[in-house]
């Protein structure tokens, strides 16, 4: 049984980063953990996300399961379950990143989504420094 409201949010940001730097920040768990705070990824993840991988993240006692549906040079698609029932799609290129999040949740997804993207932009900016 899904609790919460259906929510949908999309953001596209300009970032001062190469396509490769963006890809690595979205597909390497060690880098994801550096910018996704206060959300915590489960320990023991492989160095790079791969299609079919399922992992959990936690935020204030709420657990989200992420299943990697697709990962390639410019796209990451995740199926979400648990505290968010839906999907999260990422697309990127040189100098930009776009995220589309849809799901049913009690969490304020638009706020969480915006905060995460601005953290990512800040992280990528620090990498360039």
Where in the sequence are the language-model features?
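Beta-strand/loop substructures that line and gate deep hydrophobic ligand-binding cavities in soluble
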Residues: 75-129
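Glycine-centered tight beta-turn/hairpin loop motif at sheet-sheet or coil-to-beta transitions
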Residues: 6, 59-61, 83-85
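Short glycine/proline-enriched coil/turn segments at helix->beta-strand junctions
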Residues: 18, 60-61, 73-74, 93-96
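Short, hydrophobic/aromatic-rich segments at coil-to-beta transitions
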Residues: 48-56, 70-79
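Hydrophobic ligand-binding cavity/cleft-lining segments
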Residues: 1-46
